[in-house]
Curated annotation (Swiss-Prot):
GO terms for biological process: translation. The gene is rpsQ. It comes from Azotobacter vinelandii (strain DJ / ATCC BAA-1303). This is Small ribosomal subunit protein uS17. Belongs to the universal ribosomal protein uS17 family. HAMAP family: Ribosomal_uS17_B. InterPro entries: NA-bd_OB-fold, Ribosomal_uS17, Ribosomal_uS17_bact/chlr. One of the primary rRNA binding proteins, it binds specifically to the 5'-end of 16S ribosomal RNA.
Amino acid sequence: MAEAQKTVRTLTGRVVSDKMDKTITVLIERRVKHPIYGKYVKRSTKLHAHDETNQCRIGDTVTIRETRPLAKTKSWMLVEVVERAVEV
């Protein structure tokens, strides 16, 4: 039997915390149309992602993908750093 290929979910967001060891917090923002008023509203989600080499810093734009649960709240893994944050 041929098993169905499961597509891997990937998201792009901004790193808002890198204080944990090998873990980053990524803020995912999306725009949703209000069902009654029709205005587009920003909605956001914070996800914990696994960063094996601790390469991400606050403000970086990253791509993450879904993976097996690695901890109680961590089920995402870092794929790549899309854009580095500007150092001040």
